[in-house]
Regions:
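Extracytoplasmic beta-strand/coil segments of soluble accessory domains associated
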Residues: 103, 107-143
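Flexible loop and strand-edge segments within Gram-negative outer membrane beta-barrel domains
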Residues: 235-242, 246-252, 266-345
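N-terminal periplasmic "start-of-domain" segments of outer-membrane beta-barrel proteins
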Residues: 65-95, 125
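Short strand-turn segments of transmembrane beta-barrel domains in outer membranes
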Residues: 186, 191-220, 230, 245-249, ...
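Outer-membrane beta-barrel signature, preferentially recognizing the C-terminal barrel domain
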Residues: 286-309, 341-343, 400, 431, ...
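Gram-negative outer-membrane beta-barrel transporters
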Residues: 412-418, 508-510, 532-621, 676-680
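C-terminal beta-signal and adjacent terminal beta-strands/loops
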Residues: 512-513, 561, 613-620, 628, ...
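Short acidic/polar hinge/loop motifs at secondary-structure boundaries
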Residues: 144-171
Length: 683
């Protein structure tokens, strides 16, 4: 890559060995002078070589993960430096999991609730720590790709799971980092580009007419890298409507291009992606039709840069997202009854940070314009816009602009990290002035392997266009909704070694003006769902997890490579009102248990077994009766042969063939089996 790092290099002279397990790794990118070693010292070193070889890879991987920069603050911090709890799903975890979509993969993250109305991510609501799908920020390479129309479309990722390097999950309010949609946290998906020119192809098939095929090609030429990928997925689905027709079928195509330039003074990255999906919606949005249908299309473009000054860094980015949606409450019954919507989001981020002896200081601004034109959402338009390919117009719309300014300072000492900042934000929609949302994170290393942390953070969320204007088919929106606000306290402890990693955290969230859809069942079946602001909603939660990497203790040939188990508990203290049914705010996972293990059966033959138990609080109505969600257990597994250039796999979800519901009246599929292969080669 021919990078000139002379300005940032420093000399290190080894005079003696230490017990620090990462001493050699920490010398990378530094000029190293080897001091004189006596013969007795060399003899002692030689005796330790054999034992060290069994755990070098585990230590190196742990150090590598600790030094990954994550987006939990405005200035870049590594996992080991971050004062907040940031969960990282690395490439190995992604490859081993019995999952074919990002949505399915996130089910195994303990603080994340994935509620599916369809299979393999056909329609998915993702939330964090008991929040709703509208209360998190979804990012792709650090770019906010949330759809202001509705969080139902937030998981329309224009990139295939095979192109992902890692997924970062930041739990808890992140207003000072991500702005006006990160009320309960953020999920950042980071893609990868091959380091050398090459290509890969994959194909798989399975139950219910499932097929997925795709691949990518990359070209590396000096300082430039370019990679293009694409995939196609389809299935007949697992259910039928009363007339016997398909109502959970889907097909989706994705295309993604990414490139970068690595210069001496600046790095530049650029992206473009598209996702096109059609899927049967069963009874997703109402029980009076069991043959609903939806079409979505998402466009994504972004350009990012970062200067390479020794002390000052400038990180601008500009992006444009477009989302298109067509909803058919009665599938194929005439375009005049369909709902059409198109959102456009244009954003500019200007982030700066300065490194001094006092720490890292970040400051900057963000401008984000969100607009919608629709047949149902918004105010009447003076000049309607023609809908492409249809003899109808977008005759309603709304536009709002959010501007924010942030300031954050981080102090990093050998055993202590403190990060504090504030964001000032203003939106043209509410007509109010700037509001300030502060936050502070602190951590202290008690011993080499023990760290405690605590945080106080605040955030807000503007109502989605659906919450403001969706009035039809049993729904009545309120365009005068207020923005949600959140305060959160969190504390925890971490124990991190190459062989054992454990965390325990406790948090308390205090929310005001929380938005929800509620319905009063005492007023009869015709009473609509109404969007409202709850006065307040308090949440208390506990999360605990432990991972054992047995390769550190017995070497890479260990039969049980690793085992991890996690538990989450949530309690909301707002009492349920008689006859009032909540769609989202008062429906949450009270208990969640996740356990996973990776086994090395023989040579390159590996097995992943994943277990989940979930107990959800909430009610739904069916046939005029109020029903409570029942807890359920799911068991998934993946068997794979992992060679250098190819991989063969077979996997199954819901092996026990359980009947369960994530959303009322929408059953989830039973056992689902898939098998496939991947082949990689270099040019």
């Amino acid at each position: 890559m021919n990078e000139n790092n002379q300005k940032s290099s420093r000399s290190v002279r080894f005079r003696r060995f230490t017990n620090c397990p990462y001493a050699v790794f920490r010398s990378l990118k530094n000029q190293v002078n080897i001091g004189v070693l006596t013969i007795p010292m060399l003899a002692v070193a030689n005796l330790n070589v054999a034992s060290a070889q069994t755990d070098n890879q585990a230590k190196e991987k742990m150090y590598e993960m600790e030094e990954v920069e994550v987006t939990g603050s405005r200035a870049p911090l590594t996992v080991s430096q971050a004062a907040r709890l940031v969960t990282v799903l690395d490439r190995e975890a992604i490859a081993n999991a019995p999952a074919q979509s990002v949505n399915d993969l996130l089910k195994y993250a303990i603080g994340v609730d994935v509620r599916q109305r369809g299979n393999l991510g056909a329609q998915t609501d993702i939330s964090i720590r008991g929040g709703s799908f509208d209360q998190i920020t979804i990012l792709l390479n650090g770019i906010n790709i949330c759809d202001p129309q509705t969080g139902h479309n937030a998981a329309e990722f224009p990139v295939d799971i095979t192109e992902i390097e890692r997924i970062e999950i930041l739990e808890g309010p992140a207003g000072r980092v991500y702005g006006t949609s990160s009320l309960m946290g953020a999920i950042n998906i980071v893609t990868r580009i091959d380091k050398q020119s090459g290509a890969a192809v994959h194909a798989e098939g399975g139950s219910y007419g499932y097929f997925n095929g795709g691949g990518h090609a990359s070209v590396v030429n000096g300082r430039f890298s370019n990679q293009v990928s694409g995939s196609y997925t389809r299935s007949d689905g697992f259910s039928r409507n009363k007339a016997g027709g398909l109502n959970a079928d889907f097909k989706q195509s994705k295309g993604f291009y990414q490139g970068n330039y690595r210069g001496d003074q600046v790095d530049v990255k650029w992206y473009a992606g598209i996702s096109n999906k059609d899927f049967g919606s069963n009874t997703f949005y109402g029980v009076s039709s069991d043959d609903q249908f939806e079409h979505t299309r998402k466009f994504y473009t972004a350009v990012q840069a970062e200067t390479k000054g020794q002390n000052y860094h400038f990180k601008p980015s500009v992006y444009w997202n477009r989302g298109e949606d067509r909803f058919e409450y009665f599938r194929g019954k005439g375009e005049n009854t369909y709902n059409y919507g198109r959102t456009d989001v244009l954003g500019l981020n200007l982030n700066n940070y300065v490194e001094t002896v006092l720490g890292k200081t970040a400051f900057g601004a963000e401008f984000r314009n969100e607009g919608i034109i629709s047949t149902k959402l918004g105010e009447p338009l003076d000049n309607p816009t023609k809908i492409h390919g249809v003899d109808r117009d977008y005759d309603k719309g709304l536009n709002r602009t959010n501007m924010s300014f942030h300031l954050e300072h981080t102090v990093i000492l050998p055993r202590f990290t403190l990060s504090a900042g504030v964001i000032a934000t203003k939106n043209t929609w509410d007509g109010e002035g700037f509001k300030f949302y502060p936050g502070v994170d602190v951590s202290y290393q008690l011993a080499r392997d023990w760290k405690i942390y605590a945080s106080y953070n605040t955030s807000l969320r503007l109502p989605s266009f659906t919450e403001l204007y969706y009035t039809m088919q049993g729904y009545k929106a309120d365009k005068h909704l207020k923005a949600e606000k959140m305060q959160a306290f969190e504390g925890g402890i971490k124990y991190l070694t190459p062989g054992v990693k454990a965390t325990v955290s406790v948090y308390r969230n205090h929310g005001t003006n929380m938005i929800d859809w509620i319905r009063d069942t005492s007023k009869g079946e015709d009473e609509p769902w109404q969007s409202v602001n709850h006065t307040k909603l308090n949440t208390t939660g506990v999360e605990a997890s432990v991972l054992f990497d047995f390769r550190h203790f017995v070497g890479q040939s260990a039969f049980v490579k690793d085992f991890n188990v996690s538990y989450s508990y949530i309690d909301k203290d707002k009492e349920s009102e008689p006859n009032i049914v909540s769609q989202y705010a008062l429906e949450y996972l009270k208990h969640k248990v996740v356990a996973q293990t990776n086994l090395r059966l023989y040579s390159k033959l590996n097995l992943n077994v994943s277990y989940r138990w979930q107990d959800r609080i909430g009610n739904y109505t069916t046939d005029g009766k109020t029903m409570s969600y029942k807890p359920y257990t799911l068991l998934d597994a993946r068997l794979s042969w992992d060679a250098k250039q190819y991989r063969l796999f077979a996997e199954a979800n819901n092996i026990l063939n359980k009947t369960y519901y994530d959303h009322g009246n929408v059953p989830q599929p039973g056992i689902w089996v898939r098998a496939g292969a991947t082949y990689r080669f270099n040019f």
